[in-house]
Amino acid sequence: MSKKIDKWEPDDFELETNTVWSFPDRGKWATHDAKYRGNWSPYIPRNLILRYSQEGDLVLDQFVGGGTTLVEAKLLNRNIVGIDVNLYALERCREKCDFERENCGTVHIKQGDARNIDFLPNESVDFICTHPPYANIIQYSEDIENDLSHLKVPEFLEEMKKVAAECYRVLKPGKFCAILMGDTRQKGHMIPMSFDVMKIFQDAGFKLKELIIKEQHNCKATGYWKTNSIKYNFLLIAHEYLFVFHRQ
C-alpha cells in the first residue's frame, strides 16, 4: 500500500556550488528518515543526481542500504537499480519506495554483490551514486558472507578494487561515478581509508572530477567523546570525502 506523502521536496533547495557541503537538517521530505544507521542525508544524492544525470537516465546504487538514493532518483524521474547483499536493507528499500507520483522514475531492487554485477551490461549505466560501508566501522549484518562491512581495512580495500572495476565496466563513457567515503582511527592514528579508495578508483581508470568535503553533524564534542578527545589527545573525525569520478 502506497504511503501518504505530506511533503515531496525540501524547502528552498539550491544546488551546491562549492566543495564543502554541510547539511545540519537531515531532510524529512517524502519517505526519508534517519533510522538506518550510517545512511547519508538525502541532500547529497539530490545534489549529485541533479548535477550529473538527466531525467530518464539509469542510475546505479550498489550499496543501497536504507534506500535514500532510490527515493531521490525516483522523485527526480531517474530510473535506478539498487543492489545490496542485505535482505533486511532491501525490504526497507521496498517500503521507502512504495509511493506514487506523476513523472517518477522506476526502481529496480535486487539482492547482489557490488563486486560482481554481471547482470548489468557493459557501458549501460548513466550515473553511479553510492555510499559504501567504511570497512567494519559499522557492521550491517551478523552472518552475511559477502557483506563488506565485516572486513578490516586492508581486506576491505582489496575488495574495493573489484567494486571499482565493476563501476568502470558498467558506466558509460563520459559519465560520472560519485562515492562518499570516510576515514577511521586505530591505536591513536588516522587511517586515511577514503584516499586509499580514491586511488583504487583512479587505478581502475577513472579521473577525479571533484573532491568534496562533507561535514558530519552527528559528531558532537560533548560528554564522553569530548572528555576522551582531550584525555587521549585526538581530534574527533567530523568530515567525510565525496569523490566524483569521470569515466572518459
Question: What label would you give each PLM region?
Answer:
Residues 1-248:
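Class I S-adenosyl-L-methionine-dependent methyltransferase catalytic core
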